Design a protein with these regions (language model features):
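Extracytosolic ligand-binding ectodomains
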Residues: 4-8, 20-394
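Hydrophobic h-region of N-terminal signal peptides that target proteins for export
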Residues: 10-18
Length: 394
């Protein structure tokens, strides 16, 4: 656990952190620091902590209230561990809100088992399962990432525009993997593509030759891997390359990151993919450099935006009580109001303190829709000379 303290003044909180204007508050950052997507967590956490620091050091947040952060490990795949970590953040750390979790299953478990019963706001930067769009949340759950219902459509369009008319699909055997695989298959076949096979795989296995044999037998011009970049997914790629079953892949969001690039390099040349992102992410580079994290890493902009939106909603509400500020998330995220970009949080706080309106764009061009999730902007990638390269935005 890492804790960033930006003041030494002690504060006493009610359970759940529902103190309106205390001298300091704490926000929990609940991400999968261990598990199959662990390499994604540090830059996401760093980005969220950078936003908290920016707000706190401005001196403009709720009459000078200081913002502290504390980390919890959701492990990505262990629902019990995610719930226990969320419980600790609320009952022991007295947080006023939670940024997280990282993976969809852990997010759903932590929210439904802990956050919802305790009336706590959660904003996930990266949980994308379509199933989270319809959970009963009492207006407490939000996402700065879009649903995989949207990613499935984007993925289908990219493949067909690149004249890929048939694919095999394998997905990590959990809510995220199945939700994305099903959304993609529906969109791809509706547009005229053929899915030759759509099967799950388990993460953490030493050998994926059996799964790859089934995929190869079904055929397809490319292999779509709706898995994780630190477990499962690399094993599938390695087995496919070793056997010659596939040499071109399509990589969804949780398969894109430095660890994949470092491991396979130019063996993945010509492979395609997509991850939530917008041109605004380039504005995060300087913030990342100043705070020792990669500002353009997958889901880092969404991490910054999740923290920024939570704190700006508190400022708009004049309260750190989740039952109060939850009703202001849409107000600060969407038009009308002055557009707010990364690094402009002090400006936003001042506008809100003066009774004005803001339209927070942030690093991911976030716009909240119906169920409290981002409408969705994606960065399209291609592996060129062994490097994950941005080729456009959608």
């Amino acid at each position: 656990m890492k804790r960033i303290l930006m003041a030494t003044t002690a504060a006493v909180f009610a359970a759940g952190g529902a103190q309106a204007q205390s001298e300091e508050i704490t926000i929990g950052i609940l991400l999968g620091f261990t598990g199959p997507a662990e390499s994604l967590a540090p830059p996401m956490a760093g980005a969220a902590e950078a936003a908290a620091k920016e707000v706190s050091e401005s001196g403009l947040f709720l009459d000078g209230t200081t913002v502290n952060t504390t980390r919890g490990d959701s492990t990505c795949i262990d629902a019990a561990a995610a719930s226990a970590a969320a419980e600790r953040l609320i009952s022991s750390e007295n947080v006023s809100g939670i940024i997280g979790a990282l993976c969809s299953g852990a997010t759903g478990a932590a929210f439904q088992n802990v956050a919802l019963p305790n009336g706590m706001v959660m904003i996930s930067p990266s949980a994308t399962s379509p199933g989270l769009s319809t959970i009963e949340d009492n207006g407490l759950f939000f996402r700065t990432s879009p649903s995989d219902a949207r990613q499935g459509e984007i993925m289908a369009d990219i493949l067909l525009e690149n004249d890929v008319s048939s694919v095999a699909v394998t997905y990590t055997n959990n809510d995220y993997g199945k939700g994305l695989a099903d959304a993609f298959e529906a969109a791809y076949t509706e547009r005229g593509g053929e899915v030759t096979i759509n099967i799950p795989h388990e993460d953490g296995k030493a050998d994926y030759s059996a799964e790859v044999a089934s995929l190869a037998s079904a055929g397809g011009e490319r292999l779509v891997i709706a898995g994780y970049l630190d477990q499962g997914g690399p094993g599938i790629i390695q087995a496919a390359l070793d056997t010659g079953a596939f040499d071109l892949f399509h990589l969804p969001d949780a398969m894109i990151g430095d660890s994949i690039e470092d491991r396979f390099g130019d063996q993945l040349d010509g492979s395609l993919g997509q991850v939530p992102g917008s041109p605004n992410a380039e504005l995060m580079v300087e913030i990342g450099e100043a705070n020792d994290y990669d500002g353009t890493a997958p889901y880092a902009p969404e991490g910054y935006d999740a923290m920024a939106l939570m704190l700006l909603a508190m400022q708009a509400a004049g309260s750190t009580d989740p039952q109060v500020y939850k009703d202001h998330l849409f107000d600060v995220a969407n038009a009308p109001g002055e557009e707010i970009l990364p690094g402009e949080l002090a400006k936003a706080l001042e506008i809100l303190a003066d009774g004005g309106e803001i339209n927070y764009e942030g690093g991911s061009a976030v716009e909240l829709i119906g169920p409290g999730e981002s409408a969705g902007s994606y960065r399209q990638i291609e592996v060129v000379d062994g490097e994950i390269t941005t080729v456009g935005y959608r």
